[in-house]
Curated annotation (Swiss-Prot):
Chain spans, region Catalytic: 35-307
Name of the protein this chain belongs to: Acetylxylan esterase A
Source taxon at top rank: Eukaryota
Chain intervals for the UniProt region annotation (Disordered): 313-346
Domain CBM1: residue ranges: 346-382
pH dependence statement: Optimum pH is 5.3.
Gene name linked to the record: axeA
Processing and modification events after translation: Glycosylated.
Similarity comment: Belongs to the carbohydrate esterase 1 (CE1) family. AxeA subfamily.
């Protein structure tokens, strides 16, 4: 009996040890080699075929933050990894960097299709969101320290991510982009080019722009990421008017009076840069004489994200704080918008919303006003 019991215990011990080793091996295999750019597959639903690359620093923090860094047209994850300061800053502050890569020819991002511009719609935005949730799960990341940034087409996608998945991000920085929904394709084309938007001809009010962003996640009432918007006055790819329209959009989302900012600071953060603050959640930075795109200000990003600031003992080298990226925006078929008609009961007041994807309120305006189509997400009584 004693011999049998001893044999049973030995067998049980070996079984549990091997089972534990197999489980540990699976967990380890899901993680990547620290200190180099690595591709990740199997991160979740990925209908658009977007590629995921990740940089895990050797100096990984406990419960690390995450920065999603999104490349420009013609760019790649590798190009943005080498051409931006985020991997260097990750070693300093211990956060993980996700570098998505566009699946399309020319590698612009899909910021035009209904799928991409809708929460859980299955486009590029959904794939990137799934990269974030995978990384949170694998590395026990701090969900209060997840951020998104990008340049040019990546800046457009940054605005889209902030609108479609506001629950995932605490803050965003946008380098030379356009507002969320500005590139919308009436033909539902993925990765479409919109010349009207690019040239700054799509002009609207904060209420309309804000409604467009909000309707990308209809019914959402939680917190939204703080937005920092950069643009250059000499941008001839995505014209400077897009700076004002993007700032209008987020002023509308946060309920700020766009025409009455709290402060305007000249020569901040650099000479010929003007910083405008509408409130704690929105800051615009307009760079006079700067083209496409505004150089990445890594140190300012770290302050905006909360990795550095007053009381921080860390210092950032100049080489890791401001980085110029070469971005090329390829021209594709221009898509125009067309009006839609819906029927419902009730009456919307002047300036009120009267239509849009996911809208369940009144679609008839009070006497004297017309329900005016802006895009698929927003119509307004004007």
């Amino acid at each position: 009996m004693k011999s049998l019991s001893f044999s049973f215990l030995v067998t049980l011990f070996l079984y549990l040890t091997l089972s534990s080793a197999r489980t540990l091996g699976k967990d380890v295999n899901k993680r990547v080699t620290a200190g180099s750019l690595q591709q990740v597959t199997g991160f979740g639903d990925n209908a658009s075929g977007t590629l995921m690359y990740i940089y895990v620093p050797k100096n990984l923090a406990t419960n690390p933050g995450i920065v999603v860094a999104i490349h420009y047209c013609t760019g790649t994850a590798q190009a943005y990894y080498t051409g931006s300061p985020y991997a260097q800053l990750a070693e300093q502050y211990g956060f993980i960097v996700i570098y998505p890569q566009s699946p399309y020819s020319g590698t612009c991002w899909d910021v035009s299709s209904q799928a991409a511009l809708t929460h859980n719609g299955g486009g590029d935005s959904n794939s990137i969101a799934n990269m974030v949730t995978w990384t949170i799960s694998q590395y026990n990341a701090n969900t209060a320290k997840v951020f998104v940034t990008g340049s040019s087409s990546g800046a457009m996608m940054t605005n889209v991510m902030a609108a479609t998945y506001p629950e995932l991000f605490a803050a965003a920085t946008v380098y030379s982009g356009v507002g969320a929904g500005c590139f919308y394709s009436s033909s539902n084309q993925a990765d479409a080019w919109n010349s009207s938007c690019a040239t700054g001809s799509v002009i609207s009010t904060p209420a309309v722009w804000g409604g467009i962003a909000k309707n990308m996640y209809s019914g959402y009432s939680g917190s939204r990421p703080r937005m920092q918007i950069y643009h250059g006055s000499a941008d001839t790819t995505l014209y400077p008017q897009n700076y004002y329209e993007t700032c209008k959009q987020w002023a509308g989302v946060f309920g700020y009076n766009y025409d009455s900012p709290q402060s305007t600071l000249a020569n901040t953060p650099d000479a010929n840069y003007q910083t405008t603050n509408w409130g704690p959640n929105l800051q615009g930075i307009y760079a006079t004489g700067v083209g496409h795109t505004v150089p990445i200000h890594g140190a300012k990003d770290m302050e905006w994200f909360g990795f550095s600031g007053s009381g921080s003992s860390s210092t950032t080298t100049a080489s890791a704080t401001k980085t110029s990226t070469t971005s090329t925006t390829s021209t594709k078929t221009t898509s125009s918008t067309s009006s839609t008609t819906t029927s419902s009961t009730g009456v919307a007041a002047h300036w009120g919303q009267c239509g849009g994807s996911g809208w369940t309120g009144p679609t008839v305006c009070e006497s004297g006003y017309t329900c005016t189509y802006s895009n698929a997400w927003y119509s307004q009584c004007l």
